[in-house]
Amino acid sequence: PWGGVEQLAWTKDGKKLIYTCRKKIGIDYAESTNTDLYAYNTENGETVNLTEGMMGYDKNPVISPNGRYMAWESMEREGYEADKIRLYVMDLTTGEKNDFSEGFDQNAEGLKWGDDNTIWFISDWHATDEIYSLDIPTGRITKHTDGVHNYTSVIPTGKMLLATKVSMSKPAEIYK
């Protein structure tokens, strides 16, 4: 919906472009919050809706390092812009989708793959934005930071994380 590069992802083999799109026109476009993720095949020109039947915002796809999985942010209901942002993962070989944030009563935003089994993200906790991770094999979500500040992004880089942190008393700074 906003048109940034975070709404695009290439599959590891470079043959498909995953993109976010709201394929509506006129008033329907203006009133709808239903976006989907589409896979455009660069070899044959075919486009497939990967999130068909999911009625809220589906956006910001990220592909796992091994190319097998795609994670994305998803809202459940159309027309409800304040809906919880869920963390979904799809197996790109089978099409199976899993909501890993079911039972996690917070948003999951700014998804980044650490390795093939870990997704790092930002979530709000008691009016602060903190760093969390999802361990895919167990489904366990772990909170890694706590304080009177906001983390605005997190990037896994091998054995360490880089993150930007802001507070009322400090401008944005990069931490590791």
List each model region and its residues.
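Blade-terminus and WD-like Trp-Asp/Gly-His loop motifs, strongest in beta-propeller folds
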Residues: 8-16, 61-69, 111-118, 154-160, ...
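A flexible loop/linker signature enriched in serine peptidases of the S9 family
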Residues: 1-5, 20-36, 49-62, 71-88, ...
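Hydrophobic, helix-prone linear segments
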Residues: 14, 39-41
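Secreted/periplasmic carbohydrate-active enzymes, especially glycoside hydrolases
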Residues: 12-15, 143-146, 174
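Conserved glycine-bearing catalytic or ligand-binding loops at nucleotide- and phosphate-handling centers
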Residues: 154, 172-175
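Short loop/turn segments that connect beta-strands within beta-propeller blades
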Residues: 41-45, 91-95, 135-139
